[in-house]
């Protein structure tokens, strides 16, 4: 397999109804570079793992599946679910070989077939910045009605400093692409840090 330029890291837990749409939206991306899709399941009780394995079998050069350790039928309070999500994202992050990384939740999908190409082009053009990321507007989508609604106020096209970003702007985690800090020997996941839909 060619060295991937972008690694898409996807976490799943009991999301079998969404697996196909999520992965199809990623694999339908139109890029002039290779990608890798790393999927982790956190002990789903439905057939999420079986569906993921089917995609891995169809696209062995692109899709890899990791099944996390779990106790069958284990009840997970919210704080445990967040810690597990951190562990999953950390595991996938350590496996990622791409120059750039995107996170995607297992029940979300890309709507723009050029999302990865557009964001990679922006990051490629900004070679002087070590810790650059870029994001875009996101929306809620209701399958039952086909209606959408912006997650937050629309983002205008602009460049922001870290201070500006953290002071007022929310960009959904799934809308971000950022440089693979691990390739720079930096670990952004400090143990014990609570992460809940934050930048990292």
Language-model-derived ranges and their functions:
Residues 101:
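Short aromatic/hydrophobic "clamp" motif used to bind/position activated sugar donors
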Residues 114-149:
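Conserved donor NDP-sugar-binding/catalytic core segment of glycosyltransferases
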Residues 15-28:
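Short, well-formed alpha-helical segments that are part of the catalytic scaffolds
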Residues 105-109:
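The conserved acidic donor/metal-binding loop of glycosyltransferases
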Residues 4-7, 36, 199:
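Cell-envelope/extracellular polymer assembly enzymes that use nucleotide-activated donors
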Residues 25-77:
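Acidic donor-binding segment of Leloir-type glycosyltransferases
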């Amino acid at each position: 397999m060619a060295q991937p330029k972008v690694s898409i890291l996807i976490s799943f837990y009991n999301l079998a109804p969404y697996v196909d749409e999520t992965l199809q939206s990623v694999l339908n991306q139109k890029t002039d570079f290779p990608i890798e899709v790393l999927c982790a399941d956190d002990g789903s009780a439905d057939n999420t793992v079986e569906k993921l394995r089917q995609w891995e079998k169809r696209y062995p050069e692109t899709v890899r599946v990791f099944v996390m350790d779990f106790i069958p039928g284990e009840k997970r309070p919210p704080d445990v679910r967040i810690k597990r999500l951190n562990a999953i994202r950390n595991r996938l992050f350590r496996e990622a070989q791409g120059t750039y990384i995107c996170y995607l939740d297992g029940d979300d999908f890309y709507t723009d077939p050029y999302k990865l190409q557009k964001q990679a082009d922006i990051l490629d053009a900004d070679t002087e910045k070590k810790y650059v990321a870029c994001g875009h507007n996101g929306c809620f989508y209701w399958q039952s009605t086909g209606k959408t609604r912006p997650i937050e106020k629309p983002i205008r096209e602009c460049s922001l400093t870290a201070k500006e970003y953290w002071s007022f702007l929310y960009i959904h985690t799934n809308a971000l692409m950022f440089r693979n800090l691990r390739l720079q020997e930096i670990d952004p996941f400090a143990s014990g840090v609570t992460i809940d839909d934050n930048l990292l």
